[in-house]
UniProtKB/Swiss-Prot annotation:
UniProt KW RNA-binding keyword: no
Keyword vocabulary terms for this entry: Hydrolase
This protein's name: Glutaminase
Keyword Hydrolase: yes
Enzyme class: hydrolase
Quaternary structure, from the entry: Homotetramer.
Catalytic activity from the UniProt record: L-glutamine + H2O = L-glutamate + NH4(+)
GO MF term (any one): glutaminase activity
Amino acid sequence: MHALLQEILDEVRPLLGRGRVADYIPALADVPADQLGIAVCSAEGELFEAGDARTPFSIQSISKVFSLVQAIGHRGESLWERLGHEPSGQPFNSLVQLEFERGRPRNPFINAGALVICDVNQSRFATPELSMRDFVRHLSGNPLIVSDTKVAESEYQHRARNAAMAYLMQAFGNFHNDVEAVLRSYFHHCALRMNCVDLARAFGFLARDGICPQGGEAVLSPRQTKQVNAIMATSGLYDEAGNFAYRVGLPGKSGVGGGIVAVVPGRFTVCVWSPELNAAGNSLIGMAALEALSQRIGWSVF
């Protein structure tokens, strides 16, 4: 597997330069664009890696999966009274759809849905930022994970559209806590710095019917695990989820930091990272690497 991963990285590396590093978040614009890493973790905990798999990066929207899992653990099925689990078909930060649907986001992975999830967790935890940090430290087995305060502050200073969504949902009665406090938590989560190895391990419970490989406890029930994987498959890559399903065929979640995590239920979790993004905001080389890996090994849920 190590040799195969290195072979795939060598195969996709010529694509460097065809994408663009996220520049609408100033603190992310400085990330060197030529970095590329991949890690695969089996359901039994065996790890394989290649390239810059241990270089930390800003996980951004990948954090929405961890937030969702925390909220499901707190609210269970009642969580879905406040948001849906359908694909959006609109840009991840659309205000038009949110107003048309009276403040109820389509799913937890568009920004409005992620803010509702953070609002739920704000009501549950006294210190949501520390609760999230400790949660991902436990899932990954890495006690050194931190949030990049420079990135979080940079995102907070450019919060206008996210704030507009939160206040709009508040106007419809679907936002219960202080908007600015929830935004602070949201950006803190997005600014968590993890590497491919951390994320491949942290997502392991989604390949094991909800059982955490690190501690052996149930993070989710088997039914809840299936639900999270299903939402990742339909909505995990914004309006490119269909293309990802077509090319890769696995549940996945991306972030504008250049990371993509994919789950092979019952078998493996994979994380690939390359900071250059395509027009849809997903890692251009990451998509190509996961497609190649899926084709070589025959991984697909379809």
